[in-house]
Amino acid sequence: MLRLYFVALQFLAIIPIPFSFRCREEDLGRSMSFFPLVGLTLGLLLAGCDYLLALALPRPVADLLLVAILALVTGALHLDGLADVCDGLAARGGRERFLAVMKDSRVGAVGVVGLVLALLLKYQALFAVTTDKWETLLFFPMVARFSQVQLTVGSKRARQDGLGSLFIGGAGSMQVAVAAFFTVVTGWLLLGLPGIGCAAVCSLFTCLAKAWFHRKLGGITGDAIGCVSELNEILCLMTLVAIGGRF
């Protein structure tokens, strides 16, 4: 169990692990059960950084640094997926054209605009959190990592290569159930009803995104997983801002 957590951590973050372990290909799909716990680990890092930054910096600067820290510690992997999907949306053509543009290592103008807007929205949504900030910092990366599991399980591969193809088909209902349990229980313990409501909103969005990618591309890719993860981070923060003070 612990080994699978470290497999997930090694894939989702660039946090150094001070020991080596064997990772088999089938471990990648099985490790998705622990994706939300990796999100919680990232949240703990953000909460700790927030405590230290608040000692010396005004909140606007501290929150901007938190967004930067999250991007750095994840290697900007999911932001890259968001940019690629934005470029794919801007490309005129069918499925093959969309996939070809996403695979291109260069980032186009629409991808840059998408990145800037996403980072600004994430920063503004985080800055708008007025209550339960540490609880929010713990929870929103967790919800986004659960969305990766939800999007992946039961999906088809839009193409056979890429990082996403290693996970698609390797995880099943057990991984979704375990990941959902971790996410829902943590959301309830940290935030109560707003946490459950936020998880439900993000889960619904992920279902819609999953259907859209299957209709557009015939399946999902690693870029699609990263894009949906980034959008769910923003959606989670915005939802908590919208409903947090009502309960």
Curated annotation (Swiss-Prot):
Protein name per the record: Adenosylcobinamide-GDP ribazoletransferase
Pathway entry: Cofactor biosynthesis; adenosylcobalamin biosynthesis; adenosylcobalamin from cob(II)yrinate a,c-diamide: step 7/7
HAMAP family on file:
CobS
**GO MF term list:** adenosylcobinamide-GDP ribazoletransferase activity; cobalamin 5'-phosphate synthase activity
Q: Where are the transmembrane segments?
A: 1-21, 37-57, 61-81, 109-129, 176-196
- Principal localization reads membrane
Q: What's its catalytic activity?
A: alpha-ribazole + adenosylcob(III)inamide-GDP = adenosylcob(III)alamin + GMP + H(+); alpha-ribazole 5'-phosphate + adenosylcob(III)inamide-GDP = adenosylcob(III)alamin 5'-phosphate + GMP + H(+)
Keyword annotations for this protein? Cell inner membrane, Cell membrane, Cobalamin biosynthesis, Magnesium, Membrane, Transferase, Transmembrane, Transmembrane helix
